[in-house]
Amino acid sequence: TVPTGKKSEVTFVLRGADKTYKQKVSVTPMRHWNVYLYNHAHVDIGYTNTHKNVEQLHKNNIIEGIKLAEETKDHPDGARFVWNPEVGWPMERLWQSNPEMQDELVEVMKKGRICLDASYLNLNTSICADEELFHVFKFTREMQRLSGVPSDVFQQFDIPGMSWGLIPVMAQEGVKYIISWPNTDRAGNAHKNMDGKPFWWVGPDGKSKVLFLQPGGYANSGSMGKGGETGRPWFGQRDPAKVPKVIRMGYANVDFTEKLTALEKENYPYDYTVLSWSLWDNNPLDADVPFAVKEWNEKYAYPKIIISGGHEIMSMIEEKYGDQLPVVSGDYTEYWTDGLGTAAGLTARNRNAKEKLVQAETIWSMLADGGKAPREDFDEAWRYILLGSEHTWCFENPTEPYFQDAIWKVKQSYFHEAEDRSIDMLDESLAPATDKSNGALGPKEGPANGGIAVFNTHSWPQSGVIRLTAKESLRGDKVLDSKGKELLSQRISTGELLVYVPDVPALESSHIRVVEGKCSLLGSCKIEGTTLKNDCLAVHVDRITGNIVSLLKNGSTYNYIGEGANTFSWLPGNVDEPKGDTVVSVAVGEEGPLAVELCVTSKATGCRRISRSVRLQAGQPWVEISNVVDKLPLVEKDGIHFGFAFNLPDSKTRVDIPWGVMEVEKDQWAQGNRNWLAMQRWLDVSNDTHGVTWCSLDVPLFEYGNRTA
């Protein structure tokens, strides 16, 4: 036996009948490696099978994981089986569907046989709303409370990148660690100079921090090789009875010496590595692993393999290396948010549902007079919103019609359910402010006969324009406030009545009443050709292109627009050959004292029709833009882009992200995405003298500088 504690010179001697051969060799000892093996099945909600079958498979993995942990309970340390559900969704679904198992689930968590990590789903975190991020941890916080076992690792699989704004939320929720396992496909620079290098990640508040580790891509153990050998009997199998409960093939290749030797050659500074063991996506667990690990550890002192959960891995790194690790700030800009562009309408529904839920919860606090909020109903609405933000969309094989249609149907339902629930919760929260219905038909003057309450759910005073439906404003076009003072109003082409309501106090309401007659007030809005004006701005739309070519503040000649704004272009996949639209008409949409609007109708490649409306409202220092694209269902990849070229040289672009503000480039990691970025509600482009704040209600994605995808 050659000693391995230090580098040694060893002489090999070979003696023959009449000759002796000697050779000196240098023996470098192998590091005393600990290999932490994280057993899981990657959780895609859909993608490889119907949602129902995927849910059943992951619930079964927990049940089988409990059995395998019991079977291997007498194995030596490191070889006892531990199952990691990866995210909270499989455990939560099992908790809800099998209440008789709840005590057992808590008990196996206490024993360390099931290790529950902190996130509910694998999410596009950068498109999550501020409040939404707290609901990511709701279920696992409850399980942590019941079990007393820390669920303090945010595991993110598949998705390259995650939002900087996650950090302060994690800190508040007691989640101390992140392990990121990004895919290697469509991942850009996500793996560049970062895999296997832990560091402290400081949040945008400059105070909160978590310990971050990116071991590499998931299944970096090579386990997908075995997954491929199985033929993936779980993939696209309609009958769940035909899916094996577990995978048993009598072997699992846990010889990682080649990987470890490569790390040593790269001067990797640590004595551990972290590997993911997953056979593929949504797969049955591999029951061979604990037996292969036991055999390996009994045969070799090192490398030692340790079947682990996330907390064990990260707490080891913190304890052993925490005070030696670098501190990093900035945004790990996500790559896979482009999927939202394939479902722009549904994405808009989810964004608006989030805002409604925030309003509903605020109004409940304002009106319930201390009454208990329907917390479970609110939480379930947020759960559907999270399912919309989850990273999977359709079937892995899009040419297979049954699964493609079945999976897409359920994915769409999450957005619709979230929208419906948000509307219901808003209606319920407003109930204390409503009058009793006056008979089956109601008053002939409409439901607003008793007046209208206008609520401000912001923590600052607010003025603005509200819309009353035709039924809510049957009595007339004139509106009075609670003191009888007339308010500026305008009946528009949709039949709705616009009303300017000034100075609603923070977290309070104002009362208005629709009365007979016409509005007698004069507003500041007017149209001159294709120029819209109010008392703050003048915006000019080019009659030929339909683009905004001029934006001036009143009293100034400075044009905030560069080459044009709200410009349409269609881009074929992977070819930088954009095509513009052809304007069919530019027409007046609205013209009155409170609002003026121009509507541009055009045709373009890849679309049946495009409409772009530009609107100003009296007293408001902003331009409202509404674009509607009637897109053709093309099979080949393509994209729709609206460009905004501002005349703001040497400017900086700052973006509203969850719980923070990110400056483009300055605050982005080198590993982050540059092709498209996500924002919450606004971005700001400013230099030392001028600036534009650009808000988007429906669309979270933007490109910076030029079309980049």
Predicted feature descriptions by range:
Residues 457-461, 513-563, 628-630:
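Beta-strand-rich N-terminal accessory domains
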Residues 424-468, 521-534:
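Surface beta-strand/loop "capping" patches
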Residues 50, 216, 466, 517, ...:
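Residue-level detector of alpha-helical segments with a strong bias toward transmembrane helices
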Residues 468, 478-486, 566-570:
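Acidic, glycine-rich two-metal-ion catalytic cores of nucleic acid-processing enzymes
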Residues 1-451, 476, 482-485, 489, ...:
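Catalytic-domain carbohydrate-binding cleft regions of carbohydrate-active enzymes
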Residues 455-475, 638-647:
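Surface-exposed beta-strand/loop patches in extracellular or lumenal glycoproteins
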Residues 540-599, 692:
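An extended acidic
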Residues 16, 481-482, 534, 553:
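Structural motif
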